[in-house]
């Protein structure tokens, strides 16, 4: 179970709704993955070229999954705050995935403006989930202004590279043990999702890895299973890696000459 802002969700997977081949494939993918939330932006066009409107909103409602609006495409504090306020009116929710991009090539979050916007929105009653880097200090500042969960990236959006800064992500997890951390962006394979879940991260948010795959419906299922498997492995307590071999079969009753040195 995933807990965010004192609210509990049955899944640790969050799924984006952009760039699916057709609305029907989007709907089937969501139903297959059964995510905790589905993200959507006021700025994006609907699936298959459908304009963002009542039809797309009806499709989202049919899935029965809570909607997490985002501020994708925003590059200033005022733009992000205004978009979040509009999203609250349209989708009737205080949840917001806060995105503030600082570089057009890498789509890296502008953590300075992110902190400022997060503080404004939290004071306005929003439950803010900020899309951020793995920078520990920036993440602490987001917590200082009232964020109760963070969404650090694994790699730049849409790259599918997996956790390119594994050390920094593991440090972040170690130093913020009680903060829900959801890996957002950069994952391309279910194995990569399982890996970060094995490290102890609380959830994963995906879009491109599913929507642009050869078979989004089956890929959605694959990621859902990977996230669940990774979490189970973390909770089970994996064995530590060793430099030397260690037999799993007991040596009791083994003939003495088997241990002789040659």
UniProtKB/Swiss-Prot annotation:
EC numbers on record: 2.8.1.10
Q: Localized where?
A: Cytoplasm
> Region Disordered: which residues?
243-262
Q: Tell me which residues this entry annotates as catalytic.
A: 97 (schiff-base intermediate with dxp)
The record's CDD domains line, in alphabetical order, gives: ThiG (cd04728)
Provide the primary localization.
cytoplasm
**What Gene3D superfamilies does the database record attribute to this sequence?**
Aldolase class I
- GO terms of molecular function: thiazole synthase activity
Q: Where does 1-deoxy-D-xylulose 5-phosphate bind?
A: 158, 185-186, 207-208
Where is it found, in Gene Ontology cellular component terms? cytoplasm
Q: Which InterPro entries match?
A: Aldolase_TIM, Thiazole_synthase_ThiG, ThiG
UniProt record, GO biological process: thiamine diphosphate biosynthetic process
Kindly state which reaction or reactions the protein catalyses. [ThiS sulfur-carrier protein]-C-terminal-Gly-aminoethanethioate + 2-iminoacetate + 1-deoxy-D-xylulose 5-phosphate = [ThiS sulfur-carrier protein]-C-terminal Gly-Gly + 2-[(2R,5Z)-2-carboxy-4-methylthiazol-5(2H)-ylidene]ethyl phosphate + 2 H2O + H(+)
Annotated keywords? Cytoplasm, Schiff base, Thiamine biosynthesis, Transferase
What domain of life? Bacteria
**Under which pathway is this protein filed?**
Cofactor biosynthesis; thiamine diphosphate biosynthesis
| Known function | Catalyzes the rearrangement of 1-deoxy-D-xylulose 5-phosphate (DXP) to produce the thiazole phosphate moiety of thiamine. Sulfur is provided by the thiocarboxylate moiety of the carrier protein ThiS. In vitro, sulfur can be provided by H(2)S.
Assembly:
Homotetramer. Forms heterodimers with either ThiH or ThiS.
Family indicated by similarity: Belongs to the ThiG family.
UniProt name for this protein: Thiazole synthase
Q: Which gene encodes it?
A: thiG
